[in-house]
Amino acid sequence: MTRRRERGQQPVGTRRAAREFAFRVLFEAERGKLPLETVFTRAEGDMREGDDTFAQLNAEALAFARQLVDGLGERRADVDAALRRTIRGWDFEQMAQTDLNVLRLATYEMLYTPEPHPPVIESAVRIARKFGGEDSGRFVNGVLGGLSRSLKTAPRLPQNTGAEDGPQE
């Protein structure tokens, strides 16, 4: 049964809520083997109709969630490659889907947006704790902390390049 939000509840505009919305879209798309666009559109419609499974996002937060979902869709191979370099000794198939999806979203954001790493990591850890297993928060924090340290020594990747373009110098 779908719960409905109370009338008059104001939309939220936090990046954390947008990240959680994007995570839920990614998780549902992966689980149902559905296109990201299809799931995003359905989730947006459910949100607008008052389904409280999804936070009521304001326009800015919804645009940020869209940027994360679309960006990850376009850059997933690069994001997965960065994660594989960071997570040694783990196969993606060994990881909980929740942890992997949280890591993918945060890694995309750390690689391709100007957002500072600490709030990205903090939000990812909170989402992992909320939706994942007992050790998800620690695991996500460790992986993203390692990624952040490695990125401080590497040049930042540009956000708006085509999928076929490599990092620009």
UniProtKB/Swiss-Prot annotation:
CDD domains: Terminator_NusB (cd00619)
Top-rank lineage group of the source organism: Bacteria
SUPFAM superfamilies documented for this protein: NusB-like
Record-annotated disulphide pairs: none
GO cellular component: cytosol
A molecular function GO annotation: RNA binding
Keyword Transcription regulation: yes
Biological processes, Gene Ontology terms: DNA-templated transcription termination; transcription antitermination
InterPro entries: NusB-like_sf (IPR035926), NusB_fam (IPR011605), NusB_RsmB_TIM44 (IPR006027)
Keywords, in A-Z order: RNA-binding, Transcription, Transcription antitermination, Transcription regulation
Function: Involved in transcription antitermination. Required for transcription of ribosomal RNA (rRNA) genes. Binds specifically to the boxA antiterminator sequence of the ribosomal RNA (rrn) operons.
Similarity-based family: Belongs to the NusB family.
Name this protein carries in UniProt: Transcription antitermination protein NusB
Source organism: Deinococcus geothermalis (strain DSM 11300 / CIP 105573 / AG-3a)
